[in-house]
Amino acid sequence: MPIIYMNIMLAFTISLLGMLIYRSHLMSSLLCLEGMMLSLFIMNTLMALNMHSPLTNIVPITLLVFAACEAAVGLALLVSISSTYGLDHIQNLSLLQC
């Protein structure tokens, strides 16, 4: 296995570990989630380049679109929570509240 793939998998693992450790703050969770999406995007791009198939080129672009939508929704949620509560703690959220 080439070292670039090992580095990308290590970046994904560190981002996943950060997501598990810093799950109480929304901003930290969003940053770790973006790190995971970035490492998945780079891995999919490298795989598509190695396969030399035009059908595999759409997968990284689709993943990039999903990452952009996730970032927009996450930042909107962060702004809404921080303006309402003044904090970015996830325990302030509840689906039972109106």
Swiss-Prot record:
Gene assigned in the entry: MT-ND4L
GO CC, alphabetical: mitochondrial inner membrane; respiratory chain complex I
TM region positions: 1-21, 29-49, 58-78
Localization annotation: Mitochondrion inner membrane
InterPro entries on file: NADH_UbQ_OxRdtase_chain4L/K, NUOK/Mnh_C1-like
Gene Ontology BP terms: ATP synthesis coupled electron transport
Record-linked Pfam families: Oxidored_q2
EC number(s) on file: 7.1.1.2
Keywords associated with the record: Electron transport, Membrane, Mitochondrion, Mitochondrion inner membrane, NAD, Respiratory chain, Translocase, Transmembrane, Transmembrane helix, Transport, Ubiquinone
Enzyme category, top tier: translocase
The UniProt record lists the keyword Transport: yes
Reactions accelerated catalytically: a ubiquinone + NADH + 5 H(+)(in) = a ubiquinol + NAD(+) + 4 H(+)(out)
Similarity comment text for this entry: Belongs to the complex I subunit 4L family.
Taxonomic source organism: Colobus guereza
Gene Ontology molecular-function annotations: NADH dehydrogenase (ubiquinone) activity
Function statement: Core subunit of the mitochondrial membrane respiratory chain NADH dehydrogenase (Complex I) which catalyzes electron transfer from NADH through the respiratory chain, using ubiquinone as an electron acceptor. Part of the enzyme membrane arm which is embedded in the lipid bilayer and involved in proton translocation.
Annotated membrane topology: Multi-pass membrane protein
The name this protein goes by in its record: NADH-ubiquinone oxidoreductase chain 4L
UniProt main location, coarse: mitochondrion
Subunit comment: Core subunit of respiratory chain NADH dehydrogenase (Complex I) which is composed of 45 different subunits.
Keyword Transmembrane helix part of the UniProt annotation: yes
Origin: domain of life: Eukaryota
